[in-house]
Amino acid sequence: RLLTVTGVQTCALPIYALDARWKTLQREAHPDKFSAQGTAAQRVAMQWSVRINEAYQRLKDPLRRAAYLCEIAGAPIDAENNTAMPAEFLMQQMQWREALDDATTIDSLEALHQEVMQARASALDQCQQLIDVTHDFGQAAQQVRALMFVERFMKDIEARLDQFDVT
């Protein structure tokens, strides 16, 4: 029910609509609303509240939301076992890794971070199109797996940036 804030399950989910739906569902399932019905009803409400929060955390992240939509459409991500990537993507990853290894200044790291963030945004847009427009969940799952690599690489860049003392 949380994902269908607009009446349809979609990857292009406005965060304000998701937030509003989450708050509504939290109010409906709040354990205090069930105090007159006893502890068993409150316990069930608490379980629903936890599930609503877990769903919200998953859906507010665009990559996790895309992965979920692929999975419910029958295209599992299976990132642990399916690591095949297009050659072009692997070449880009190697170039970025080399750039990270060669980066010695904050400016060079920030430039690389900006480039990777732009590539991530573009890949998320493409993933959204694959899910919402063409309904090509197999290709979208491939895109999600690629984005998982990009996310990990962004964390590597951020870790290197953290090594610089910017006081």
Predicted features, each with a name:
Residues Y16, T39-R43, Q47, E80-T83, ...:
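Short, solvent-exposed segments of well-ordered alpha helices
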Residues Q95-T167:
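Accessory regions outside conserved functional cores
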Residues R1-C11:
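Single conserved hydrophobic/aromatic residue that forms the stacking wall/gate
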Residues H30, K60, R64, P76, ...:
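Short alpha-helix boundary/capping elements
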Residues R64-Q114, Q118:
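Conserved, surface-exposed functional patches that form binding/active-site neighborhoods
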Residues C11-L13, V150:
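Generic detector of short, aliphatic-rich beta-strand segments that form the cores of beta-sheets
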Residues H30-D32, G38:
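Proline-aspartate-enriched helix->loop->beta-strand connector
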Residues P14-A29, R43-A67:
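J-domain helical core
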